[in-house]
Amino acid sequence: MNSISANLNIMIKASEKASKALIRDFGEIEKLQVSKKGPTDFVSNADIKAEKIIIEELKKAKPNYSILSEENGYDEQKDKKNTWVIDPIDGTINFLHGIPHFAISIALKSSDEIISGLIFDPIKNEMFYAEKNNGAFLNNHRIKVSKKNQINDCLFATGGKTNNESDLPYRKSGCAALDMAYVACGRYDGYFQHDLNLWDVAAGIILVKEAGGLLEEIDMAQTKKLKIVASTPDINSKLKEKLANF
């Protein structure tokens, strides 16, 4: 593995430990007890279990870091500057329906900046990770955004209800974290979506940036109702024109 920080190593170990429980639960999906959390957002025992494992591992290593997570919200600790941002299962609905497209997402926010992040797809065993000024990687191999420069040749990812993307070639996968990871490694050429939570995209933000992509400025003090437009540099302005009313 290329040289990584102690904090990123902690994140990798936490995600790998949580993934073992997720894979077991995914194999017995019909036995999961699910409680309704919102009209299109369901929380499962697997989600809660994975988050607990991740938080325990992170706290063991850095007990004073604050935590922002999907299930527990913001847990302020002595160190308010550094915050772990956790989504134990991004793509929960896919997971609950037996669709093997979901991921663990963990990022570290220092003040108002994401400085490291990982997105782990336990089914495909793909670990995407990045650190500030150190590049983006997939399973120890450096990754870059695509070099497409014609918007008609591109494939984009989006999610939720959108009204302005009809003339863009796009896919809706149900997993924002993997959508952004796929932009970072060139599988998608861009990603756009409304109404995101910070834990959905925190790791993806640094992955795209470190892979050479462009994103609109994001207020890191805001944790909900985020809008993301991310893409390869050569089509960024054209994509923004297409999404002028997005």
Language-model features: locations:
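N-terminal subdomain of lithium-sensitive/metallo-dependent phosphomonoesterases centered on the IMPase/IPPase/PAP
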Residues: 1-89, 244
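Small-residue (primarily alanine) positions within well-ordered alpha-helices
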Residues: 15-18, 136, 204, 211-213
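An extended, acidic
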Residues: 144-246
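A structural micro-motif at secondary-structure boundaries
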Residues: 138-142
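Generic detector of well-ordered alpha-helical packing
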Residues: 48, 71, 88-91, 122, ...
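Active-site/binding-pocket entry motifs
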Residues: 28, 73-74, 136, 162-163, ...
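DPxDG-like acidic metal-binding loop motif
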Residues: 78-137
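Residue-level signal for inorganic ion chemistry
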Residues: 18, 22, 47, 58, ...
